[in-house]
Every structure is written in structure tokens, then in C-alpha cells.
């Protein structure tokens, strides 16, 4: 059975790069009827926080990336890492190193001065010296001194690294906490991970991890290293490119299915398909369709995708999503006589890019907005006064339907010898405080007769003054 995993470090929020890695691992497992495992690599004691762990869990839940096992925490598995380290020590495949930080710094400085690559020189590898008192040693792997490591990356192809390029990496630190390379290998082995799908910033770690597995006589998983994500300027993705946390996109009013769709298309493709469901992603997903070149993050494309999903979203769902945004804007959407929020969503959803914009566009349905003086000056003209007063009379008694409202606007314009916009635009500004809205008869129909007339009367003083 195929088993994949996502193993973030809880030192920050779930960002775009991590979310895409999680999505690819999730999709591959789901495609093949396998298992998707979540593991929290919390061995960075200074930077790991419970808040970051929760942010990762929340981000995955919002994106719908459900896991079959976990979350497992590395700090709860220390005894297991010690057990394996002891096994390697007994076999002579690992050793204690008593070098101080100062010694290591001096060693690297000398190597740089000699034009050499800084690396551990193996001085404790076969040492028979008496260990210095009071020093907590690290445990190092006896990396092979010759030969090479070759593995087939499912995205990048065959990769070969000479063992002479690798030094004796640390397995356990002096405080007994495993290093990244050791912990991840033991976890993947114990959890029977068959496919390690991760960012290509881990490619250089792979030969080291393979040598640990070989020392243990353990089977190797298959590796797939996903190219990094760049900003539009070709630089590594950072906050200045809009690479905020996944949950920030929720706060900004993006739909999770739009972000999932966008993340999937960042470096992976299925023909020319731009928009596809989660089910289609699982059906089509294959590692062979991941591009070897870095993907470029395009906020405008993400916004466009979100707009497409908003257009077809269920109105009741949109109404629930928009409520917190409207409440933050001082709108009561539950009071008696307020417009049906679902109908408001239906009227507005094709005009916006995000839930936040949808809320902004809906505000005037739930509280009056005072028109800017420039709008009053532009539209509250002497020419409009007569038809507006006439329309006010008509609106007080007609059947409150969109077509009847439209007919009344047209009739008032005709009766006063002006074109329809000369009536519709002042009316729009009076009632909504805006110059751009959906068809004004549709707006008035949802707003209701009583509220429409109240708002008109409030603005009529500017015509009559």
C-alpha cells in the first residue's frame, strides 16, 4: 500500500509552499487508495510552538486535507531515536564525537582559509583518546568514505552524489534530541512511508538519509522532490510576493476549493484544464506531470480562480461566509425587514473576486451609506428633481417587483423628457450611496419599499434645498 506523509515543523504558519507539498502528498495517497500520514517535526525546541502546530492543523482542515494517521510528534518519540542510535553505536556504524562548538568553528575556519569545503573532519571517528570530562557528546554516523549514493527521484530523475562529498552527520545532539536527518529517517521507516514527497530544498539531505537507512539495513522509500515556488520576479517566494499563511487567505475571503485548485496548478498540470474539482484532481494526479522547473506564484491568477468559484458557489453557503465580514462592518443581517442575504449573494457574486469584496458590495443593503458630496453634485441636478419626485410617488403604490420598478423609472423619465439614466443614476446614489451597483430595480426589489422610500426621503432634501 502506498503511504505518504506531510511533516511540517511548527515554527510558523502553514504557508503556500508547505500547503502545496501537503496537497501533492495527499492527492497521491488518495489517487492510489493509500494512506496519508501527518507528522509534526517539533525538535526545534526554541522555535516550535503550540500556536504554530494549531495553525498548521487549522490550515489543513480548511483546505480539506484529511489525514489517515497522526498527528505524530517527534518529541514524543525520543526513546525510539535513542534506541536506534544505540543500535548503530553497538554495530560500529556510529560513534560519539566530543568536539566543542569552538573546536568545530576553528576547524571550519581553517578549512575555508585553505580553500576547502567546510566539513567535519572525522577526528573522533576512530579515536582512542580519553573523552574529555564534562562534555556531552553528539552521536555521528560513520558515513562511507568511498563509493556513491544513487537514487531515482520521481520528478528530477537519477541523482548521484559521491560519499566523499558527505561528512559524518550528527544523529543525536548533546541534549539527546535527534537532528532533522535522523528523526525523519526513523519516522519514515517506522511509519512505513513508501513515497517521500517534499520540497526540493531537501534534495541534498536525501543521500545522507539513504546512508542512514543503508546502515540500518532498511528498505528505501521512493523520493519525489517538488521544485520550489518563485515570485513573479523569479526570486524565491516570500511575504513581499503575497506568500502569506494559508489562513490569511481565508481571512481575505478566498474559498478553500479555489486555493486548492490554484496550489495544484503550481507546477502540476493535466492538459489545459484550469478549473477542476477535488475529485478530478485525485483522479488525474500523477507525479510524472509535475514540472521540473520552479513554479511562479501569481496572485492575480489565484484571484481569478476564486472569482470563478464564487460565481457558481451556493448562495446559502456564501451567506454564511459573508456574515462575519458584514458584522465587522457594522451590519445586522438578522434584523426584521432586512433583505434576504441569499438573494443579495446571488445578485452580487458575479461582480466580486473575494468574500471580503462581496461583503463590501453588500453593505448598503443592510445600512444606509451617505453619498459622497461629489456624487451629489454630479447626479442631484435640477433636471433630475422632477422625475425623482414623480418616481417617489409611483414607488409608494406600485407592485413591488423588479419589472414594475423598472417600468416606473422608465415612465418617470419619459414623462419629463429625459433619458432613463438621468433618473436611474440619481436614484442609485440616493438609495445605495454608490455610483456602481447591479441593476437598480433589482437592488430596490431586495431592499424593500419601506427602506427604499426612507432613503429617498433622506436625500430629497438635497434636491429641495
From Swiss-Prot:
Protein function: Catalyzes the attachment of glutamate to tRNA(Glu) in a two-step reaction: glutamate is first activated by ATP to form Glu-AMP and then transferred to the acceptor end of tRNA(Glu).
Keywords noted in UniProt: Aminoacyl-tRNA synthetase, ATP-binding, Cytoplasm, Ligase, Nucleotide-binding, Protein biosynthesis
EC number: 6.1.1.17
GO biological process, alphabetically ordered: glutamyl-tRNA aminoacylation
Family, similarity comment: Belongs to the class-I aminoacyl-tRNA synthetase family. Glutamate--tRNA ligase type 1 subfamily.
Organismal lineage: Bacteria, Pseudomonadati, Pseudomonadota, Betaproteobacteria, Nitrosomonadales
Motif 'KMSKS' region: chain residues: 236-240
Cross-referenced NCBIfam families: gltX_bact
HAMAP family in the record: Glu_tRNA_synth_type1
Protein name per UniProt: Glutamate--tRNA ligase
One annotated Gene Ontology cellular component of this protein: cytosol
Catalysed reactions, semicolon-separated: tRNA(Glu) + L-glutamate + ATP = L-glutamyl-tRNA(Glu) + AMP + diphosphate
Cross-referenced InterPro entries: aa-tRNA-synth_I_cd-bd (IPR045462), aa-tRNA-synth_I_codon-bd_sub2 (IPR020751), aa-tRNA-synth_I_CS (IPR001412), aa_tRNA-synth_I_cd-bd_sf (IPR008925), Glu-tRNA-ligase_bac/mito (IPR004527), Glu-tRNA-synth_I_codon-bd_sub1 (IPR020752), Glu/Gln-tRNA-synth (IPR000924), Glu/Gln-tRNA-synth_Ib_cat-dom (IPR020058)
GO molecular function: ATP binding; glutamate-tRNA ligase activity; tRNA binding; zinc ion binding
Top-rank taxon: Bacteria
Top EC category: ligase
Positions of ATP binding: 239
Self-association and partners: Monomer.
Cell compartment(s), UniProt: Cytoplasm
Residue positions of motif 'HIGH' region: 8-18
Pfam families in the cross-refs: Anticodon_2, tRNA-synt_1c
The keyword rRNA-binding is assigned to this record: no
